[in-house]
A protein has these predicted regions:
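Residue patterns forming the tRNA-binding/recognition surfaces of aminoacyl-tRNA synthetases
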Residues: 1-26, 83-85, 93-98, 102, ...
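Generic secondary-structure transition motif, activating predominantly at the C-termini of alpha-helices
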Residues: 33, 65-66, 166-170
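Protease-associated
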Residues: 30, 37-111, 120-124
Length: 192
């Protein structure tokens, strides 16, 4: 954290990301924040855990998580966190905090899961920061060795396993079922 958050207990500090594609989490290399939006360090008064998320989305996120006893202990612009490192939720590696203007405050947490092998914005953002490109899925749609214990699993089949593991380890703040559009091949009608 470059000493910027040294006054906080790092073992209880978590950046909260939101994703609809759980299977892409092994490919996470970064967490994107909007440079000029306000981000809050939110303390769960029930267990002492602290979460970093967009200040504008705090009430919504904490509501989804079912946490009503919380307080904002400090706020910073997204640029404050640039180049900090966060532990990956289930792999022995870190994710870099990066800045991106495409991060919006209309949904999610304001902290965007960034996996350069799975999205154009993710790729461009990581490239801008000189990060390696990782595609931890092979041509058959299975996780590669980079995905650790999920190696060899078909990506769609790994979703419930990753979710279960995150719940059991305490790395999951909340989950909910949502319906949204997803790109499909116009010829074969399969997900891309």
């Amino acid at each position: 954290d470059q000493g910027k958050l040294s006054h906080l207990d790092k073992s209880k500090l978590n950046f909260v990301i939101w994703t609809t594609t759980i299977w892409t989490l092994p490919g996470n290399l970064a967490i994107a924040l909007h440079p000029s939006e306000s981000y809050a360090v939110v303390k769960n008064n029930g267990n002492g855990e602290m979460y970093i998320m967009a200040e504008a989305l705090t009430d919504k996120v904490m509501g989804v998580a079912g946490i009503s006893d919380y307080e904002i202990v400090e706020t910073h612009e997204g640029a404050f966190f640039e180049n900090m490192l966060a532990d990956h939720p289930f792999l022995p590696k870190t994710s870099r905090l990066v800045l991106a203007d495409y991060v919006t405050m209309d949904s999610g947490t304001g902290c965007v899961h960034t996996a350069p092998g799975f999205g154009a914005d993710d790729y461009q953002t990581c490239k801008r920061y000189g990060m390696d490109m990782v595609v931890p899925v092979d041509d058959q749609g299975r996780h590669t060795d980079y995905a650790g214990k999920y190696a060899g699993m078909v990506v769609e089949e790994s979703n419930p396993v990753i979710l279960k593991d995150m719940k059991e380890s305490g790395a999951l703040l909340a989950s909910e079922e949502i319906v949204h559009s997803y790109p499909h091949c116009w010829r074969c009608k399969h997900p891309i």
